[in-house]
């Protein structure tokens, strides 16, 4: 699912900030998992040496939670298959409801709960 961000996105430096956020989410994922050479999907545990087939997914929606957009803790790493599976299952309900991500991740949802609890 892609959102058109338009000129507001381009003119605000959003592309660079987003790329930096994405990179930081991947690096934080590696540290939390304890790996130095691989990136891991939080849902299915598939390891990848590159981020090409992995997605950084916002816990709190990019669109609705502007103050959390570029917070590196506001992201989890999902492989393409798991990321699309999440959005197919929950569609737009998930945009402002992080508890759906926790439900989708099952036991791994504790990492998301940890972020939400630390944010309060």
Residue ranges: model-predicted function:
Residues 97-120:
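Charged phosphate-binding loop/patch that engages nucleotide di/tri-phosphates or the phosphate backbone
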Residues 50-56:
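Canonical RING-type zinc finger of E3 ubiquitin-protein ligases
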Residues 58-64, 94-103:
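Short cysteine/histidine-rich metal-coordination sites, predominantly Zn2+-binding motifs
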Residues 45, 60, 83:
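Cys/His-coordinated zinc-binding microdomains
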Residues 60-74:
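Short linker/helix segments within small regulatory modules
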């Amino acid at each position: 699912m892609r959102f058109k961000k338009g000129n507001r996105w381009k003119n605000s430096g959003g592309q660079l900030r987003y790329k930096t956020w994405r990179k930081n989410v991947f690096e934080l994922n590696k540290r939390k998992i304890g790996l130095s050479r691989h990136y891991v999907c939080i849902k299915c545990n598939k390891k990848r040496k590159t981020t090409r087939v992995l997605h950084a997914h916002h816990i709190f929606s990019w669109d609705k939670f502007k103050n959390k957009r570029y917070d590196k803790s506001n992201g989890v790493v999902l492989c393409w298959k798991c990321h699309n599976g999440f959005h197919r299952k929950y569609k737009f309900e998930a945009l402002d409801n992080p508890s759906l991500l926790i439900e989708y991740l099952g036991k791994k949802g504790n990492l998301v709960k940890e972020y939400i609890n630390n944010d309060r």
